């Protein structure tokens, strides 16, 4: 049960980091145009 919880937390963190990177890259792209 603990492993499943840890897996969910790690998955959430990775998705949050990816979303942050995507948004920052998108803003940089819009600003540079």
Swiss-Prot record:
GO terms for cellular component: chloroplast thylakoid membrane; cytochrome b6f complex. The gene is petG. It comes from Bigelowiella natans. One of its GO terms (molecular function) is electron transporter, transferring electrons within cytochrome b6/f complex of photosystem II activity. The chain crosses the membrane at residues 5-25. This is Cytochrome b6-f complex subunit 5. Component of the cytochrome b6-f complex, which mediates electron transfer between photosystem II (PSII) and photosystem I (PSI), cyclic electron flow around PSI, and state transitions. PetG is required for either the stability or assembly of the cytochrome b6-f complex. The lineage of its organism: Eukaryota, Sar, Rhizaria, Cercozoa, Chlorarachniophyceae. It holds the Pfam family PetG. The 4 large subunits of the cytochrome b6-f complex are cytochrome b6, subunit IV (17 kDa polypeptide, PetD), cytochrome f and the Rieske protein, while the 4 small subunits are PetG, PetL, PetM and PetN. The complex functions as a dimer. Belongs to the PetG family.
């Amino acid at each position: 049960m603990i492993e499943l919880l840890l897996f969910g937390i790690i998955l959430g963190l990775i998705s949050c980091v990816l979303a942050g990177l995507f948004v920052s890259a998108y803003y940089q792209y819009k600003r540079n145009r």
